[in-house]
Swiss-Prot record:
It comes from Chlorobium phaeovibrioides (strain DSM 265 / 1930) (Prosthecochloris vibrioformis (strain DSM 265)). This is Large ribosomal subunit protein uL14. Belongs to the universal ribosomal protein uL14 family. It comes from the Bacteria. Part of the 50S ribosomal subunit. Forms a cluster with proteins L3 and L19. In the 70S ribosome, L14 and L19 interact and together make contacts with the 16S rRNA in bridges B5 and B8. The gene is rplN.
Length: 122
């Protein structure tokens, strides 16, 4: 479960390393985001010379979430960290590589580019 003020790891090579959630998309009263949900983040730590700079505000999609998620078949998926991939205005990833596994739920949410770049889909 991702909410406002949650610190997140960036799972792509856009230049950002750590970000903080400042808004969850999906209505006025929406409090939590889970796998495949979009959030607005503020960059807290970035690599020098990267595409993304510190203090920049951008959209992101949650690709790994520490809170377990129940699937239709009764199984649960859970990760060790909360991670996002930064998106551009068209909803495509800003980086050209994805680090670490991503959840299968992204395929259902039509993030095919992220799924194809990921080294492993769980």
């Amino acid at each position: 479960m991702i909410q406002k003020e949650t610190n997140l790891v960036v799972a792509d090579n856009s230049g950002a390393k750590k970000v903080r959630c400042i808004h969850v998309f999906g209505g006025t009263g929406r409090r939590y985001a889970s796998l495949g949900d979009q959030v607005i983040v503020s960059v807290k730590a970035a690599v020098p010379g990267g595409v993304v700079k510190k203090k920049e505000v951008c959209k992101a999609v949650v690709v790994r979430c520490a809170k377990e998620l129940r699937r239709k078949d009764g199984s649960y998926i859970r990760f060790d960290e909360n991670a996002v991939v930064l998106l551009n205005a068209q909803g495509e990833p800003r980086g050209t590589r994805i680090f670490g596994p991503v959840a299968r739920e992204l395929r259902d949410r039509k993030y095919m580019k992220i799924v194809s770049l990921a080294p492993e889909v769980l």
